[in-house]
Design a protein with these regions (language model features):
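Extracellular/periplasmic catalytic domains that process cell-envelope and extracellular macromolecules
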Residues: 40-44, 63-64, 91-92, 172-173
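Conserved beta-strand scaffold positions in the cores of enzyme catalytic domains, especially
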Residues: 49, 69-71, 178
Length: 220
């Protein structure tokens, strides 16, 4: 009986380890989008927008009147997720790449310095593989917890400023263009302006128009 129990424990442990090893790193939507992006080629005349739900939520080619813009945003993505799906972009050697990321990392208690380190790794990969690609690193936007929609962001308001400080330092070190969007979206309390959102994090149409106007000179 004792041997049987020991065997059962060993089998259960092996099964648990197997499940842990094969568990997906990201959610289903990430893989649906990432595998689609694998099948959609990038060319040297394209402008890539790489990001999370804020990027995913816009029709950038229509907003900016440029059919060469390719949206590579994925809802819920973290900066390491960008790195893990970067290869198809590197292969295409796009003309420009606009990057925004880090708020989902913050929701998982990742520090600004850690976000900066992963973002720097991503930028170095782009520079090494696509030396002619112009890189634009955009700041994080504020969020607004008055809406009480995202519990994992509660108490993390100041983390955005820390992350932006780290990201700007990355942009300076790597010699890429830094676009500070934060002041355009923050109210006097440092929160996302309530008229630009309906959930405290994501943008309504007016917010995307502000974003568009801030970056259109770089897209040309």
């Amino acid at each position: 009986m004792k041997r049987l129990l020991t065997l059962m424990v060993l089998v259960a442990g092996m099964w648990a380890a197997s499940v842990a090893e094969t568990a997906p790193k990201y959610d289903d939507y990430y893989y649906r989008r990432a595998t689609l992006f694998d099948a959609l080629p990038i060319t040297g005349s394209d402008i890539v927008f790489l990001g999370n739900s804020l990027t995913d939520g816009a029709e950038w080619n229509e907003l900016l009147g440029n059919s060469h813009i390719k949206n590579r945003g994925i809802v819920g993505d973290i900066v390491q997720g960008y790195v893990d799906r970067l290869q198809p972009i590197l292969k295409g050697k796009p003309k420009k790449i606009f990057i925004m990321g880090g708020v989902n990392d913050i929701s998982h208690d990742v520090s600004g310095d850690s976000i900066g380190r992963v973002m720097e790794k991503l930028i170095v990969l782009v520079k090494q593989n696509c030396p002619k690609t112009k890189i634009y690193l955009q700041s994080l936007l504020p969020f607004n917890n008055d809406f009480k929609r995202y519990k994992r962001l509660l108490g993390h308001e100041t983390w955005v400023a820390d992350a932006n400080c780290a990201l700007k330092a990355v942009a300076d070190r790597q010699g890429v263009v830094w676009i500070d969007l934060y002041p355009l979206f923050a109210n006097a309390d440092g929160k996302l302006r309530p008229e630009l959102t309906n959930d405290g994090l994501h943008l309504m149409g007016k917010g995307y128009l502000i974003w568009r106007d801030a970056i259109k000179k770089y897209v040309k």
